[in-house]
Regions:
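C-terminal motif of bacterial Sec signal peptides marking the signal peptidase cleavage site
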Residues: 21-23
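Hydrophobic core
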Residues: 15-19
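Active-site-adjacent substrate-binding region
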Residues: 252-355
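Extracytoplasmic/secreted proteins, especially bacterial periplasmic and envelope-associated proteins
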Residues: 52, 56-63, 77-92, 102, ...
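Second-shell loop/turn segments in exported
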Residues: 43-51, 67-78, 116-121, 170-181, ...
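N-terminal capping segment at the start of a domain
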Residues: 30-81, 93, 99, 317-324
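A non-catalytic alpha/beta surface segment that caps or lines the substrate-entry region
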Residues: 72-134
Length: 355
């Protein structure tokens, strides 16, 4: 009887210990498995720009160069999705809508402009810029930080078979446009995120406007319309435009100014590049191998009105952009992070100036 009781006691102790260890392991496993999990809804929100804390420059670019957003040509679903992604991101980080309680600013296109880069598709006659703002203490002055999000397709002529009614057709090929200008949009968005956090408790001296322009590839249409519609809202403003950055290799930012109105702006920005050790070259933006300027961007829409503007763009882009070579494999994300940090640094330290 005594032996039997001892055996029962030992068995009971073993069972109790087993239950305790099982329970502890279950809790531990539960704790470990719950860490770092992203729910399906969070994944969906991230893919459409609603979850900015899960996004960075690299992941934003991965989205905007993926099949859902590929080429981002004016008038296509990919362009519309890109606009929605940016709007969702602006809203989620706490920017205020700029245009009568809306982040959208409508831009109308004529038929000829709509058909240039996608001749086989019928497109709507309007697109949207996406505009958000951090309101400043003095809303009669502003800095406009901009980047365009539309891109192009490659057009190829394809001969039809002999029995076809048409002998020639244009084949449209979509390309990523990583350098031009998913890079600029990613830096724009992440700069906006950093600055909304920085100015969470105290307003900047003047408005900081974040503008994602559309239809740049059709002739600076989105930015031109923005300047036309809103220039009179401000006594003074200036522009910093981001277009075509982040290529790996030896090319620096092209920071040679070509307009006297903009010289002070360039001088102050170069000081920050020096301080933050961002490599640049004293060459003009969008030059070819023969030093001819063969391209432009949305900063020119501001210069037409005699307002100061600066373009953050890399040298060596001619021949890469608008080709299949412009893809994510040539992107230096550390370089993009350093450019973004320098831009934020410049805006904070020159908060009291309008050029």
């Amino acid at each position: 009887m005594e032996i039997k009781n001892k055996v029962i006691s030992i068995i009971s102790s073993v069972l109790i210990l087993d239950l305790l260890f099982t329970g502890c392991n279950s809790v531990a496993n539960k704790d470990v498995s719950s860490k770092g999990i992203i729910t399906y809804q969070e994944q969906l929100d991230t893919k459409v720009g609603k979850n900015p804390e899960k996004l960075d420059i690299e992941s934003i670019m991965e989205e905007l160069t993926s099949d859902e957003y590929l080429s981002r040509v004016v008038g296509t679903d990919e362009n519309t999705r890109s606009a929605e992604f940016i709007k969702n991101y602006f809203e989620a980080i706490g920017l205020e809508p700029f245009n009568n309680d809306s982040f959208y600013h409508e831009v109308y296109l004529n038929k000829e402009m709509r058909s240039i880069f996608n001749p086989n598709e019928e497109n709507d006659n309007k697109v949207n810029n996406i505009i958000g703002v951090i309101k400043g203490k003095d809303s009669s002055k502003a800095v406009v930080i901009s980047a365009h999000f539309d891109h192009v397709t490659i057009r190829e002529k394809v001969e039809e078979s002999a029995n076809s009614s048409e002998s020639l057709q244009i084949k449209v090929k979509k390309i990523q446009g990583a350098v031009d200008n998913a890079s600029g949009i990613a830096v724009l968005l992440e700069s906006a995120k950093d600055l909304t956090k920085y100015y969470n408790k105290e307003k900047p001296e003047h408005d900081i406007i974040f503008a994602a322009f559309n239809a740049e590839e059709l002739g600076l249409i989105g930015s031109s319309k923005f300047v036309e519609d809103f220039k009179d809202n401000y006594e003074d403003w200036y522009n910093i435009n981001i277009d075509c950055i982040g290529m790996n290799g030896n090319e620096g930012l092209a920071v040679k100014n070509t307009n006297p109105v903009c010289q002070e702006l360039y001088d102050d920005f170069i000081e920050v590049l020096d301080k933050d050790k961002v490599y640049y070259e004293m060459v003009p933006y969008a030059r070819d191998e023969e030093d001819r300027i063969v391209g432009s961007s949305d900063h020119m829409s501001f210069r037409r009105g005699n307002d100061a503007s600066l373009v953050i763009g890399q040298d060596g882009i001619v021949g890469i952009v608008h080709s299949e070579e412009d893809n994510m494999s040539i992107i230096d994300f550390e370089l993009l992070d350093s450019i973004k940090d320098a831009l934020v640094d410049f805006l904070i330290n020159n908060n009291d100036k309008v050029y």
